[in-house]
Amino acid sequence: MIETDKLAAERIIAATPASSHEEVFERALRPRQLDDYVGQEKVRGQLEIFIEAAKRRREPLDHVLLFGPPGLGKTTLAHIIAREMGVNLRQTSGPVLERAGDLAALLTNLEANDVLFIDEIHRLSPVVEEILYPALEDYQIDIMIGEGPAARSVKLDLQPFTLVGATTRAGMLTNPLRDRFGIVARLEFYDADQLSRIVQRSASLLNAQIDPNGALEIAKRSRGTPRIANRLLRRVRDYAEVKADGQITAAIADAALAMLDVDPVGFDLMDRKLLEAILHKFDGGPVGIDNLAAAIGEERDTIEDVLEPYLIQQGFLQRTPRGRVATLLTYRHFGLAAPDAGSPVQSIWDTPDAQ
């Protein structure tokens, strides 16, 4: 069986960071203020108002929950919020905060109006989450000192602060935690024009020469995700410097991305393998997830969490009660004739009428 977690992490079009080295590149390319932030106009407009109002009142910004698919800029927005408010940012993640004391240590070291950013906040343990509730509401925490009969609860006052939580799984947040966020913002996938502007800005920061058509070609294959766009830009830049004169044109971008097995709609080998299995091995579906996993040699979780979301979001795949089904868009993409709509796929449980 293929090591799916490792394989998913190494995909050129994966929306999660591939390595700590890539995170360094991301930090260098991040916009530093809202005026430089491309896309998410509704969220950006709301934050501009809320931040300005909080600054005028000299109060901390209300607690902010950012949710949406990975790679859309949640961490970037957290850093921008802190910078626009003129305060410090402390960053951690849900899995790191294993004990109540871990969170208490962070909270007690915050200065007035600081921002505490918790990534993957849906993965907080229940014990840590309980400590967080009074901190969010009253800027106080209760900690236990001592053990056994001598143990006692001590209430500690905290400086006013802003919690910015980020998650790709908003549905996994408990209701009490979700209700404590005054500002809730969903980040959406970017369109090609927005991504093209991001690519051109990043190219300028990387001192890469790119024309608008080259930027658009990269943008169209970036699956609506800035992180993927910036990763593809770096690889296309490498190709342009070695195989051409360093100028990224549409033709150079197309050749570089073809070399990377990224097709015109942003599919890679794994996407195509899944869709072609449904088309050719299961006559377009429906096919159960376990049968599909066995057919392509991938884990069920990898299909559900890594491969399917983008294919469903773009209309290439449907989940039905009977299994996964390829759409007409998928048939067109692979240059195949779609089945007659009046000829439903027969299930193994269907029986012919008695003669």
Swiss-Prot record:
Region of interest: Small ATPAse domain (RuvB-S): 191-261
GO cellular component: cytoplasm; Holliday junction resolvase complex
Ligand binding (DNA): 300, 319, 324
Binding site for Mg(2+): 75
Reactions catalysed, as given in the entry: ATP + H2O = ADP + phosphate + H(+)
GO biological process entries: DNA recombination; DNA repair
Broad EC category: hydrolase
Positions annotated to bind ATP: 29-30, 71, 74-76, 137-139, 180, 190, 227
Region (Large ATPase domain (RuvB-L)): 4-190
Major location (coarse): cytoplasm
Subcellular location, record wording: Cytoplasm
Signal sequence interval, chain numbering: none
Any one GO molecular function term: ATP hydrolysis activity
Keyword field: ATP-binding, Cytoplasm, DNA damage, DNA recombination, DNA repair, DNA-binding, Hydrolase, Nucleotide-binding
InterPro entries: AAA+_ATPase (IPR003593), AAA_lid_4 (IPR041445), DNA_helicase_Holl-junc_RuvB (IPR004605), P-loop_NTPase (IPR027417), RuvB-like_N (IPR008824), RuvB_C (IPR008823), WH-like_DNA-bd_sf (IPR036388), WH_DNA-bd_sf (IPR036390)
EC numbers: 3.6.4.-
Record-linked Gene3D superfamilies: 1.10.8.60, P-loop containing nucleotide triphosphate hydrolases, Winged helix-like DNA-binding domain superfamily/Winged helix DNA-binding domain
Protein family: Belongs to the RuvB family.
Function: The RuvA-RuvB-RuvC complex processes Holliday junction (HJ) DNA during genetic recombination and DNA repair, while the RuvA-RuvB complex plays an important role in the rescue of blocked DNA replication forks via replication fork reversal (RFR). RuvA specifically binds to HJ cruciform DNA, conferring on it an open structure. The RuvB hexamer acts as an ATP-dependent pump, pulling dsDNA into and through the RuvAB complex. RuvB forms 2 homohexamers on either side of HJ DNA bound by 1 or 2 RuvA tetramers; 4 subunits per hexamer contact DNA at a time.
Domain notes: Has 3 domains, the large (RuvB-L) and small ATPase (RuvB-S) domains and the C-terminal head (RuvB-H) domain. The head domain binds DNA, while the ATPase domains jointly bind ATP, ADP or are empty depending on the state of the subunit in the translocation cycle. During a single DNA translocation step the structure of each domain remains the same, but their relative positions change.
Quaternary context: Homohexamer. Forms an RuvA(8)-RuvB(12)-Holliday junction (HJ) complex. HJ DNA is sandwiched between 2 RuvA tetramers; dsDNA enters through RuvA and exits via RuvB. An RuvB hexamer assembles on each DNA strand where it exits the tetramer. Each RuvB hexamer is contacted by two RuvA subunits (via domain III) on 2 adjacent RuvB subunits; this complex drives branch migration. In the full resolvosome a probable DNA-RuvA(4)-RuvB(12)-RuvC(2) complex forms which resolves the HJ.
Name of the protein this chain belongs to: Holliday junction branch migration complex subunit RuvB
Species per Swiss-Prot/TrEMBL record: Burkholderia multivorans (strain ATCC 17616 / 249)
